[in-house]
């Protein structure tokens, strides 16, 4: 099982990635992490009770990696529960690098955005994220 760690100033967020249910989304996320794409980027959108969103190289929600990926919704049983990691997009099949972590269940997002991971440690760190806070770095643990 693959895990990702988001290193924040206050501590680490450990995320279990859903390799089987969202293989292309996970592969893209892992690739970007290994390339250092996310290092130093911010959580540019933080809405208490909803989501903390990051992964925009422009820092305002308008940027991405220069390409898009397809949604992985069919056959993906994962829901937008507390701590879910999901791919942000501006319409179907337009995800790229921006992702969000859900603070509270958001069933209206199920079947719309690809859930590709779940926070397994550090939800207290997620709860403390503020808008504009930098990610110090991300790493992948593969086993």
Residue ranges and their predicted role:
Residues 1-143:
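Cyclophilin-like peptidyl-prolyl cis-trans isomerases
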